[in-house]
Amino acid sequence: PRTLYRRPVETTATATLPRPLRGRRPRGQPPPVQPPIPDDAGKLFSWPLEGTLTSRFGPRNGSFHDGIDIAAPVRSPVRAAAAGRVIFSDDLRGYGKMVILKHANGFTTIYAHHHRNLVKDGQTVQRGDIVGEVGESGRVNGPSLHFEVRSGKTARNPIHYLPSVRHATQSSRSP
């Protein structure tokens, strides 16, 4: 299984850069080293849950899977991937108990299959706030979170908007 680990909020890197000599480097000296950029720099969202990635975005069993599924124990906390406003917190066929957040950047994120929702319509949340608990509501095989990222009505691959994962192995059930 691909196990997700929460990365530190702050990643800093320091490097001592050599001073240029009148715009030229002495012969045989390598170019100045730039500080490394954290691999999650510029990512819009945080992982909503620590768990095992069991299903990816894309074609699946003759249909299209609009998000990713992350397995975790029942009642594990599901966190807001970014600050936003709750525009839906209820039960929806297939998705079970579900929360939808609208973000200032025009994106929405969807969190489904909850044991219970912990936010109400109209509520404002910050990145990392708990919005629900992992469950098995709706059409699902075991306790997990279904997570989607949408731009307008278009589903986007959440992996492209999330920080990279360290020390991960892929589930054999994932395409």
Identify what each model region corresponds to:
Residues 1-52, 172-175:
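Polar/charged, compositionally biased leader and regulatory segments
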Residues 41-175:
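Catalytic cores of peptidoglycan-degrading enzymes
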